[in-house]
């Protein structure tokens, strides 16, 4: 807010950037992402998303979808409000997609991903698509 880069800020940024990388190479790939990461791989089959949006940006949207699938409205509100506040995606338009896009290619690739091998409950393309559509109408 003050426009000053402090040592504490640098430490925080390094922790945020490095910790997920350490975790991702320390656990079996089956336990490393769930819906948010599977959807990242699906969404990036659209070349404009892969070209114009960062990994964390797309995964942050996938996290919202994951929370909607989980029907965890309390955590969804927290994550949604955070995304809004810092300018991360909260809807398809933020990823340059239309609400009426059937996302068939996105959902197919999402479902083929190993990230969905071990989930706490069975996940299918219909669940993810319905969560995406519900997220389109969600306003926190």
Region spans (language model):
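C-terminal charged capping/lid subdomain of soluble metabolic enzymes
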Residues: 72-140
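Active-site segments that bind and position negatively charged phosphate/pyrophosphate groups
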Residues: 1-82
